Amino acid sequence: MVQSNSLSGKRILVTGGAGFIGSNIVDELVKNGSETVVLDDFSTPSVTKFSQDVKVIEGSVENLDICRLATKNCDFVLHLAAVSRVGLSEDNIARCSATNIVGTQNLLLASVENNIKKLVYSASSSYYGNQESPHIESMESEFLNFYALSKATGEELCRFFSNKYGLGTIVLRYFNVYGPRLPIDGPYGLVIGNFLSRKKEGKPLIIHGDGNQRRDFVHVDDVIKANFIAAQNNIKFGIYNIGSGVNYSINELAEMFDSKLEYSDRRPGDSDITLANIDLAKKDLGWAPKVALHEGILKLISEI
């Protein structure tokens, strides 16, 4: 599993720590002896039960004073708090802006004031839109939705605070993350989560569009590892793709579930292809994904 021994004894703030990726990160930090603080507004349902060793602050990154409180005496910040679905962001642009843009600004301000050693910002492959793949970090942005714009604005805030105030910030552009605690229900559930839910219920899998859209899926264990490496390196600022470097069509993904299929209208704002070029993360961070998609999917299916 993920190793973070050099983070043992360090005080680490995880914003959005009750969410899918954040809660998995918190579990690993606790296992490895880190003093862990969670900041989350619990605005989305969470089944996470934190260890008694975790300090939980219920509040929003939209509140600067709460960000100051949460970052006090911390060594590192792993910033995952966000309105993190395309559909949700389009339905409520004002909230998306307040959380993803103003919230990130608040956390950066508080991190400077409290002398945080490194902030790791969870960004998104939505930055690339429908550009030709594979996607490389030096590409210009192409925003298909407000969520993509809001997350890219957070990247630029990280760059500014690094240049202006010397705050170490690393931006990780996640591709399609999956694993334990993946959202499974509702219109904004992630595709693998929705597939798992419907397979468990014995229902046909719903594919939006023709199923030829291609996605680069990366396991949450590999994302955790990327966060831990990013927090500990000496790079003052950098942007890195965190994906598998391989993509699959939604039809190919569905075949792994051995279920009946139904097709419906494609969702607006979805990209055609995501595919990460991960050469820079390998070179600068020494990071590479380890969990193959077939392996990860079979394990998830065995647990439903």
Task: Identify the residue ranges that each predicted region occupies.
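N-terminal Rossmann-like NAD(P)+-binding domain of SDR-like oxidoreductases, especially those catalyzing
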Residues: 1-175, 304
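C-terminal substrate-binding subdomain of Rossmann-fold SDR/epimerase-dehydratase oxidoreductases
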Residues: 5, 200-304
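Gly/Ser/Thr-rich beta-alpha loop segments that engage phosphate groups in nucleotides
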Residues: 18-21, 61, 105, 131, ...
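Alpha-helical elements of Rossmann-like donor-binding domains used by nucleotide-donor carbohydrate transfer enzymes
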Residues: 24, 66-69, 73-76, 106, ...
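Activation loop
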Residues: 85, 124-127, 131, 187, ...
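NAD(P)-dependent short-chain dehydrogenase/reductase
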Residues: 133, 146, 156-215, 220-225, ...
